[in-house]
Amino acid sequence: ARGSVTAERVVLALNAWAARLREFRRKFIVISRDIVATAPIPNRLAEIGWRDGLAISDSRLLVNYYRTTHDGRIAFGKGGGTLAFCGRVGPAFEGASPRAAEVTASLRALYPSLADVPIDSSWTGPIDRTMSGMPIFGQRGKRPDILYGLGYSGNGVGPSFVGGRILASLTLGLKDEWASAGLVKAPISNFPPEPARFVGGFIVRAAVARKERAE
């Protein structure tokens, strides 16, 4: 349907798709996160005391993160997937994960007693990874009526709560601790232009993977 919306202020909360806007394109890289989900095993999870959707993550750069679901599955994810050239989010960033075998291997390495549990599904999706791993907020150019929040870097569940408070204060024109938070208009390093960013991303990712396998 065609139509129009009129508003006094607009918030751009576009995740990885903010790369379509030229001024944001070098603020972050678009890279995939990949997840697998096991078959339901509520009784086996109860045996090891893993209940109530407890979420866990490690401190790797190519992070492993996982939690249980309400029907007793394990949803297990891994960072460091597909890189997008020029931030273009294409078909490689949706649907079943092309890294399902790799992610499953990480799950079974951490929980060898569950190695016999089948994988029911997998999926992939893009994230917007900034140089620092921290999100950024502000106004678009000299337009105080167009605000943005981006760069959650795959850690959006917690920081997006803070981001919502920041964007609400900016949208309402408040002068409070949220509108003046350090993440607002924070200096941020740009990634190199393409193709250096794309090629360099592959090199860095491979080096980090080797380092973390050796640890």
Region locations from a protein language model:
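Active-site substrate-recognition segment that forms the wall
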Residues: G3-N43, E47-P144
